[in-house]
Amino acid sequence: MCAERLGQFMTLALVLATFDPARGTDATNPPEGPQDRSSQQKGRLSLQNTAEIQHCLVNAGDVGCGVFECFENNSCEIRGLHGICMTFLHNAGKFDAQGKSFIKDALKCKAHALRHRFGCISRKCPAIREMVSQLQRECYLKHDLCAAAQENTRVIVEMIHFKDLLLHEPYVDLVNLLLTCGEEVKEAITHSVQVQCEQNWGSLCSILSFCTSAIQKPPTAPPERQPQVDRTKLSRAHHGEAGHHLPEPSSRETGRGAKGERGSKSHPNAHARGRVGGLGAQGPSGSSEWEDEQSEYSDIRR
């Protein structure tokens, strides 16, 4: 139940958070014709939008965040690349030497990949989003994001804002990678996001946190069922041992037992005859059969 509510709530939050920016984009940049309108309905960049991005990428410089700014206004609503770049540059002075080197190399790697890959993929929005997510991951891992985060955890935490996680997918990709950079980084980011969530949404975040912990808690077997399982195993083991040590009686012995029972009802010495018959069964087969016939004859005569 908590899982369903959590999923519904997060979906609603994302829809409400992105509704106003999307509406503002449509109002300020309306489609210029039927072709653009149909392109947006199919979930792909319009031809005009594609040409504008390509022209922007060619003219953008190699230094700064110009390449990422080319993707801020697009019909696929892929935003956040420029914001991440600006956040890294504004906080670069707080990083140590390793962190500054990471910022420089990672931003350059992302800009180079965007410039070369954009013209080689389709105009469909899912393909473009996948391309952006993949190149971000490649550049962050290539230049060791985790090493920079572990040495500059406090600065990394200050850069992450709760509202950005609701509005921009590139921020979500970045945080998901940071959560794999060790327990110290993970706990610091989780605590920061939780506090910001409570500041924005109040006690609702505590409910979501409780649901998440309940979902992640592994199920435990009911204690009352364990003795039943043990008793079943012991019973099966007992029957198995009994079956192993006690062989099943043969048909001949079964027949003699039945005859002995009939004899016990008619004569008090039937048990003695049963013992004699049992001793005779251990001898040769001819002697055993002869004694059986004599026993039957005496029973009939009586």
From Swiss-Prot:
Question: Chief location of this protein?
Answer: secreted
UniProt signal peptide: 1-24
**Where in this protein does the record say Phosphoserine is found?**
250-251
Q: Where does the protein end up?
A: Secreted
Any one Pfam family here would be Stanniocalcin
Q: Which domain of life is it from?
A: Eukaryota
**Record GO terms (molecular function):** enzyme binding; heme binding; hormone activity; protein homodimerization activity
Biological process terms from the Gene Ontology for this record are:
cellular response to hypoxia; decidualization; embryo implantation; endoplasmic reticulum unfolded protein response; intracellular calcium ion homeostasis; negative regulation of gene expression; negative regulation of multicellular organism growth; regulation of hormone biosynthetic process
One GO term describing the cellular component:
endoplasmic reticulum lumen
* Keywords of this entry: Disulfide bond, Glycoprotein, Hormone, Phosphoprotein, Secreted, Signal
User: Could you say which protein family the record assigns here?
Assistant: Belongs to the stanniocalcin family.
Protein task = Has an anti-hypocalcemic action on calcium and phosphate homeostasis.
Q: What is this protein called?
A: Stanniocalcin-2
